[in-house]
């Protein structure tokens, strides 16, 4: 249960749709990126900067970000904590 997650430069994604956040340096991930481009499922949110993370969604879309995977993961954690706080307020009434 995640909300919208900032992946840099004003771009946000639906956190619930992301299944992996990975470092783009390995050869298999470079192939995955190229395959997604050929299939029309590549979303480049780097604004021309170096790709530092690849996000893989449940719809097999590949999202490129210029933000480090650790930073994006931390934003997921912060989002989850915030949602839990909101749910706790609702439960207490």
Swiss-Prot record:
Source organism (scientific name): Fervidobacterium nodosum (strain ATCC 35602 / DSM 5306 / Rt17-B1)
Chain segments annotated as transmembrane: none
One Pfam family recorded for the sequence: RemA-like
Superkingdom as given in the UniProt entry: Bacteria
Protein name listed in UniProt: Putative regulatory protein Fnod_1678
Recorded family membership: Belongs to the RemA family.
Stored NCBIfam families: PRK04323.1
